[in-house]
Amino acid sequence: AHVKAGGGRGVGGIISFRPEDLSRTAEENNSICLGCHEKGNRTNWHGSTHDERGLMCSNCHTVMKDVSRKYQLKTAFQPDTCFQCHKNKRAEMWRSSHIPVREGKVVCTDCHNPHGSYSENLLKTATVNEVCWQCHAEKRGPFLWEHPPVTESCLNCHDPHGSNNDFLLKISRPRLCQQCHSGGQHNSNPRNPLVTLYAQGRECQNCHSNHHGSNNPA
């Protein structure tokens, strides 16, 4: 692909390109790639997290080999390229509740732009919620009664890569709810021995099922 793309731009820059030439800095190596690949999702590369940490294009991509179906990645399975550095995220995805990356239903770049972003954590959208709503549109609303932690950030309740609690929750229910809802008219601790007889097997969502937002006051 690179030989064909070279056209009249010179043999030296295309065919004899050695991306990991140790005599050049990461910036100098990357500038060779960015000479052609400077548009699209790469416009925010300069100053991005990966740029600041001295990553080279060749850390993730091959130049002449066809290992992956797209993007000339170093691995056949796109997330494995990310996991070369992000080993903690690979571990999270082996938890009982996890984003279906290892099943092949989602890849890292569905949520992140590794080449740079205006938002935190190289997200493809301005906010975390907008990333989540790409798949979970039914949680977006609008609702007559919004749930403030949800409108603020899905990360208030969820661990997006993996959790040992149902639904990617950060901690188990009802303790998750009790972080904010510690008071109220009714006993907010169904595990209190004094109310076990009446609250056994019950959780907050038995009554408050639409915790992302509701058109009913409760």
Predicted feature locations:
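Short sequence/structural segments immediately N-terminal
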Residues: 1-218
